[in-house]
Amino acid sequence: ERQLRPMHSPLVPLVRQFPSHAGHARREYSTQIIGNIAAGSLAESDTVPSTIYMERPLGKNEYVVRVEGKSMEPLIPDGSLVIMRRHTAPPIPKPGTIVEYNDGRGVTLKKLIRRKNAETGKTEYVLQPINPAFKDITPMDGGSISGIYMETLVNYRKG
């Protein structure tokens, strides 16, 4: 009587062995991680480009950065790779949008909100972390919004 025996072969990722698109290999798109972005206080971006492969091409004006810090947890964990879209001109994004803010000395990733200043009574834009252990950046004067958060990469491989 014949018995089935396990084959001894190197492990191959299931997505490669059994592609999700019936009979077609999964497409991958190469892109560069262009640097790091702080999720904490403003910090200078260290540019350490490296290549990754992801399941979709980057759109026009999109780029990938690595998040450093815990101020956007749990939504965007420390060390995550995120896709950002360049933001170059008015209007200011809608409140609630996660943005890349650059004050000329450093960049940070925060949620953009509007609220009334208790002292002046004026409504102002504020950069708010998602993690309540971190403080808001107020006011948002002297800098600009340079990018809009699009998504956190989950399915990618290092080059």
What are these regions (language model features)?
Residues 94-98, 109-115:
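Short beta-strand-centered aromatic/proline hotspots
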Residues 104-105, 132:
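Glycine-centered tight beta-turn/hairpin loop motif at sheet-sheet or coil-to-beta transitions
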Residues 122-142:
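Short solvent-exposed strand/turn elements
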